[in-house]
C-alpha cells in the first residue's frame, strides 16, 4: 500500500455568496472553486502526472423581479466546470489490483541504479507476465477530461385578477447543456523478472525481460460528448 499511495494530500476550497435587492428585485449569487488531489504516487521517469487532480468551478445566480404588481419574473442560472486529471485506468481497478497482488512475488520495479542504460522503468513481474502489478497499472498513463454543465431557467407569472379573481397564468422555459471532452494516453510497461544462475563465483542474480514495452505514449484516445435538453411549461391556475 505504501509503495503506491502517499500519506496525505492537500485540498483547497473557496466560496463566495452574495444576496440582496429591494422591493422590486432580489438577487442571489454564489461562486465556488474546489481543488481536490489524490494520493497516487507518480513514477520519477514519467513526464506526465497520473495522480488525481480535480478542479471544479461553480456559479449559481437567482434573480427575482416584480415588473408590476401582477407580473413577476424569476431567472435561474447554474454552471459547473470540471477539469479532471488521473490515471488511464480507473481507481477501482487499481485498488482491485492491490488486493489481488502478492507483494512477495516481485518488486513494483527494479532499482534504476542497479540497471544503468535503461530509459524506462523496469516493472517487476514473473512467469509470462500475467501477474497484476498495481504500480505499473497506476503510472503507465493518464486521463484528462473537461466537462461543462449549464442550466438556465426563466419563469414568468401573470396574475389575471383584472379579468377574474383567482386566475393566474404561469410560463416556464429551461435548457440544460452538457459537454465532455476526454483524452487518454498510456504506454505499454516493460516487465522484468529476476533469475538465478550458478557460476564458479556462486549464484548470481540477473534481470530478464518478460514483456516488451514502449518508451513513448500512444496516440490519444479521444471521447467527445454533447447533449442538450429543453423543457417548456405553461400552466393556467384558477383558485
Q: Model-derived features: where do they sit?
A:
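Asparagine-centered polar/low-complexity signal
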Residues: 15, 133, 232-234
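Individual transmembrane alpha-helix segments
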Residues: 138-142
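Extracytoplasmic gating/loop element in the C-terminal half of outer-membrane beta-barrel translocons
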Residues: 129-131, 135, 198-203
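Small-side-chain secondary-structure face that scaffolds active or pore-lining regions
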Residues: 34-56, 86-88, 93, 145-151, ...
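Flexible loop and strand-edge segments within Gram-negative outer membrane beta-barrel domains
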Residues: 2-32, 36-39, 50-131, 143-145, ...
